Amino acid sequence: LLAQQLCDEFITEVPQVKVLHVHSGETKYDRETKHEFITNWVSRHPQYDKLIFTTYHSLHKICDSMVNIDVLYCDEAHNSTSKNHFVGISTVKSNSSYFFTATPKYSRGNNERGMNNSDVYGNTLISVPAPELVKNGTILAPLIDIHETNETRTKYNAPEIDKKVILNIIKNIKTNLSPKILVAAPNTTILWNMLTKSNIISSLKKQGYDIMHITSKHGAYINKTKVNRQVFFDTLKEWGDDDNRKFVLFHYSILSEGINVPGLTHTVLLRNLPIIEMAQTIGRVIRLHKYDYNNIHNNTIEAGNVKQYHKKHGVVTVPINSKSSVATRNRLQKLIELIFEDGLTAHSFAY
C-alpha cells in the first residue's frame, strides 16, 4: 500500500521515468519479484531514469538482482529493524541512502538491528520536534476526547459493545467539519463480527455516513461492496477531499503507518496500541485541512495560529470502560506530552 502511494507521489514530480514494482501488491506499472527479471528490466531501459518501488519484505530481491542503485529512499524506516527485514537493509548497496521515520527503533546491548547503528543507517541529518512542526503549520496538535461508558466489555459481547460505543461517540461529535473517522479495531475477528453481525452499517447509513473497512484477511469494502485496493484508496482520497462527505473507516493495523488518508478529523482507539502504532495512528488525523494548507502557503492565514484554521486539531477518542482502557488513556496522554510538549520522538527498541 505504501509503495503504491509513494509511487503516485513521486510520479507527479518526475513523470518521465520508468517504474518497476518489486512486491506482490496490485499496481498498474511493471511488477515482478524474480531477481532475473529485475536485472533484465534495468538493462532494457538504459536511456531512462528508473524508479523501483519495493517493500522491506522484498528488498533482498533487489540485492539479488545486482543492479546498481544510485539513491536508496527508505520510508517508515523503523520497520527495517525487524529480524526479517534487517538482512536486506544491511546488505543493500547504494551511492546514497536516506532513512525517514517519525518513530525510530533503536538497539540495546549487542543487538545491531537499531537505527542507532551508524554503519547501516548513518548519522542523523535532521530531526524536527513536533512543537516546531505545529508552529510552522506542518501539522496540528491532537486533542484527547474521553468517552466514558458503563458497559462491561468481554470477549463474548465485544462486537455489540464496540458498536454501541462507536455509535454513541459519533452521535456526540460536535464539529463544523463533516466528520471523517478512523476506527482502530481490537482485532480482525471483532471487527468482522461487528460489521456483519450487528446493525452498525445500517445505523451509520441512517446518520448520513458511508462505511469503509479494510483488513489483510477480508480485503477492502466500501459500504457492503467488496472492491480491490486501488478502487478503495481512490475512493478514500476522493471522499477525503470532499468536505460534504461523512464516512467511518474501520481497520486493524493496516492503515496505522505511513498511509496518507486525506481529510480525517477523528480517530477512535478501541484497543491498546503499541507506542509506535499509537503514535502513527495519531499521525493520521493531525494533517492540516486542505484549505488551511493552501491559505498558509498563500499567506492568507498565519502558520501556527490555530484560531484561524478551518480544522483546529485532530481528535483522538478513547472509550473508558475498564482498567485496561484507563491504561490506554494514560499511555496516550503520556505519549502526547512526550511528542507535542517535550518535543521528543516516540521511539522503541528492536528485539
Task: Kindly give the residue locations of the regions a language model identified.
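Conserved Walker A/P-loop ATP-binding site and its immediately adjacent core
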Residues: 1-12, 21, 26, 186-192
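Inter-Walker segment of RecA-like/P-loop motor cores
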Residues: 17-61
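Conserved RecA-like ASCE ATPase "motif II neighborhood" in helicase/translocase motors
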Residues: 39-40, 48-88, 251-253
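Post-DEXD/H (motif II) to motif III coupling segment of the RecA-like Helicase ATP-binding lobe
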Residues: 79-139
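Conserved RecA-like P-loop NTPase helicase motor core
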Residues: 80, 218-347
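Conserved interdomain linker/interface between the two RecA-like ATPase lobes of SF2 helicase motors
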Residues: 123-192, 197
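Long, largely alpha-helical accessory region at the distal end of helicase-like NTP-driven motors
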Residues: 164-175, 180, 187, 324-351
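Conserved helicase motor "Helicase C" RecA-like lobe of SF1/SF2 P-loop NTPases
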Residues: 188-215
